[in-house]
């Protein structure tokens, strides 16, 4: 969450105009940055001459704005503190008076004891009328005081009597303290509430453990509600004390909230100054933060003595409340008082996966926003929401929502599936059923008629239902046996390897390690368009190696925001830069085994799986050549703005923390173990077991939370599991062997390179039009089986080359996650940077170049390694 949002949500509504104008200061920073770049370019236009006329430096102008904000905060704080101090003094006198009169040892107030409570309860039915005639009548005004003055957290209580007695005198319908005049509302306190005293952490940690105690108190309250008015009427000498008790309790609650709000006001403004100065230093390359924060620390609201005074008064108010209502238990008093505080919205670090989920939600919202709103006085639609079909059996109404292209596609696929089952094209029943399932699942994945992960769940369901799986003897498995086999295949070491990659990506992004490394590299890229483009492409490729090419574009696009923000509106460098990062991320998808989901599928279809060292030996030279070739294409073929001066990306000046070092060491250690996995085969057994190391360490130590785990791209994980299940089904049924035999006979006369050329081209075309991972799940099992049946078998060579080709298919905006992320990029006006034609101009030649490099450079390396 951005601090501007945190400030908005946590500010006291009545004081909203008196907080630091964080958003305005941020706009000023961007304005100063733009002016600085304009002056550096030296353009002899009117804007430049006006800027040169401005004599003050950016530091002076920004300090002037900060001084104005600081003065406003001081001017607001001083009278507000005096107001609360006066209120504190008045309530202190009232409490001392109440304590001397009613809470001393020698008081004569006739409080009801348990014995009296029992007697009064037993004699209520027989003597109510007589007593009501003898005792003074309770007026409507007094009754209103009783009803409005009580709360549900303890009822009538004073330290001189027991808690059980205190719950006896309460209103029949519990009411909270009415604080509406002060803008207060009772909300559940968040654990992220700012602390005000040493034991507050313990107080908040125990909140959830007090539910049973609260329920017991509520039960006592309900049991004694019937005796309420009877006891007050029996003991009229308590009425004055009770009125004073209710009034004092309300005032203490309001005072506690007011002091706490003032503490929160100081805390939020101090954080705001610190963050906005850090942003200024980072954006303009200044060092203003340290010097100006000294000035902030000397302002009256931020003096240590001022904070200590507020905290001391807050604790004293809690002690008074404890004496008045909680038998002197300050722990309980603080918990109850905090129930009246505003809910605090905590700031949390984002992982890259949470940002991707937010992007997906924004995309969905954009789709929904395209629907035309209907005015209140208009009909929702000129057409009825259903079709009416009249038959001799009656009138049938079918909703119009069933008549669209998606439903038509889904119905067509289902019809094809039923036809394949009804009219077998293969004599063997299991193989024919498997063919029908394979065709249906492939079409559903290709058309996305239903969500991709839902189709993955359809695979095990239809496998068991159609009795497709067979045992080693060729006999069909029963439903129970099929269930065990298919679900056990879906959870395997390859899926755990994917989870391990997601975990590393989450840790590196949450603690800004990946971003710091990227900005440190980009800070040395200079300001020339070609060098900036090349550096960004290398950063995107390197990031894809370790946080996957699904997440790397999101990281890179966030880093280049200062560049995009300061480019002229008519510049085409923004398009070139975004396309370059997307294409480089696709290339980075082949750089390591965890850099893309399709690599996981490739490993699953290799026996034995390629080691990390073998993978790097192929991927690094191919990736570097592809990056240089695509950069040359973009720089000298498509880039027109060659002489613009770009904003400089500045690296952070913060030192590497202990947590960041720990995460880096664990990550590097895991990667080293992956590279040396063959040497530790007897120890770990598989790369999936090594992938458990970062999962256990990062989640076990609390560096990553269950929310981070929930934010993983589970749709991708389930999709990979569905692909593994489909591969198991096609292999077990014998269909894969049959398909491989047919294709093998057709290409038996061709040499290995020509067969590889055919499969690589087929994979490239399929991956360009459907998802990369879907293409890998459908094509790679067939490629492996065909490769193993050739006269010169090289199944691992075919699988590795075809798997890499899946990532290198990048011609269309829908070809892979990086392209889909890039096409959604918008400028500050909400207009997209790229059109489909922009991708076609760069994507088609980039794909063909990468195809040639992989075949001419990658294939000889694979052969040399024994693939």
From Swiss-Prot:
What membrane topology was assigned to this protein in its record? Answer: Multi-pass membrane protein
**Is GTP-binding tagged as a keyword?**
no
Asked whether the keyword Endoplasmic reticulum is assigned, the reply is yes
Recorded superkingdom: Eukaryota
Q: What is its main location?
A: endoplasmic reticulum
Q: Where is the composition biased (Acidic residues)?
A: 198-223
Comp. bias intervals (Polar residues): 138-152
For region Disordered, the annotated ranges are: 105-152, 165-228
A single GO cellular-component term from the record reads: plasma membrane
SPX domain: residues covered: 1-294
Q: Which family does it belong to?
A: Belongs to the CitM (TC 2.A.11) transporter family.
Name assigned to this protein: Uncharacterized transporter C3B8.04c
